[in-house]
Amino acid sequence: MSKNYLLGIDIGTSACKVAVFDREGKVIASATGDYPVYYPQEGWAQQKPDEWWSAVCSAVRKCLVKGDIPPEEIAGVGIDGQSWSAIAIDKEGKVLTDTPIWMDTRAQEICDRLNQEIGSDNIFQVAGNSLQPSYTTAKILWYRENQPEVYKNIYKILQSNSFIAYRLTGTVTQDLSQGYGLHCFNMHTGKWDEKMCEKLGIPMDFLPDIVPCDQVVGTVTR
């Protein structure tokens, strides 16, 4: 059977969008799946990654049915999504806690402290971004200071797109475009910066392998 279709997944803030295209780029079918943002305290904004996954699975099924497309004819899947989450998973792939998302500001004090201790200019020279609570860096450190039981069980920290890719393939990676959410990502080399990891206090073991955005990272597990 020929593989004539491409499937795209976008993890938005309020919903996922899924579409199937033919090889000429024509949209054959599309669907969405909604999920909430939770605001448990002032300045907090978090989501449940497992709800993203459920919404994606539902939207994919809707697309395939709507377009009358056999799953075997999907040649490839591309995934993008909201940036700057901090999805903590354990070695079994279980999500350890709700993830703060890009609009969350709970880690402002951590950012202020590190900008003083390390130097905001020094951080910027490596990462190309100022250290702010919206980024992933501060969220990881917030886990360490406020959720030690979560922190000690972290295997990897993922972003929205790498989390969905992991659920689809079982492969833990992070595409290059999302690396900038961590200030230990060296914008000049495109790699994790060991010295900045040490300064920030982020274990390199938490960080997935960085891969190009167009690299095939695996195949669907079922």
Predicted regions and their residues:
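Conserved donor sugar-nucleotide recognition element shared by glycan-biosynthetic enzymes
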Residues: P49-W52, V56, A107, T136, ...
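Carbohydrate-associated surface elements
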Residues: D104
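Gly/Ser/Thr-rich active-site cleft segment
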Residues: I11-T13, I123-R222
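N-terminal glycine/serine-rich phosphate-binding loop of ATP-dependent small-molecule kinases
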Residues: M1-T97, Q125, N153, P208-D209
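Conserved H-loop
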Residues: P70, S120, P203
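Hydrophobic or amphipathic alpha-helical targeting/insertion segments
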Residues: K91-V95, R113, E117, N122
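Active-site metal-coordination/substrate-binding segment of hydrolases
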Residues: I110
